[in-house]
Amino acid sequence: MAAEMLLASGHHLVAKDYRMGRYQADVITKKDGVLFVVEVKYRKCVPQEAWHWVDPRQIQRLLFLGASLLSEHQCSEVEVWLVGFSPELDTPILLPLDVN
């Protein structure tokens, strides 16, 4: 469902459930020269700050994974995103994750 949501907004699917050694990404897409490494989370409740669903170490690992794939997919930058699902939400949360 997360991949379909991104594809509907013009992204091109690179991989689902991608693994490289100890690194793993739920979805990888690309759009306009940007490689998007996406973490998908499901929570029963919605916290005030959804970006806490992914810890900083995991964001760093996702960023490293994306950076290692840049040239292979002819992209110039990497963004790490969260797609969050909850029964309390009508639509999923989609937001960029900052590594700081």
Locations of the language-model features?
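Acidic-basic catalytic patches of nuclease active cores, encompassing PD-(D/E)XK
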Residues: M1-D17
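Short, surface-exposed charged micro-motifs
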Residues: D17, D26, L82-G84
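Short secondary-structure boundary/capping segments within folded domains
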Residues: D17-M20, I28-T29, E72
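Short acidic/glycine-enriched loop/turn segments that link adjacent beta-strands
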Residues: M20-Y23, L89
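Conserved catalytic cores of phosphodiester-cleaving nucleases, focusing on short active-site segments
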Residues: A25-Q48, L62
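Catalytic cores of nucleic-acid endonucleases
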Residues: Y42-L89
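Short, C-terminally biased terminal segments at protein or domain edges
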Residues: S86-N100
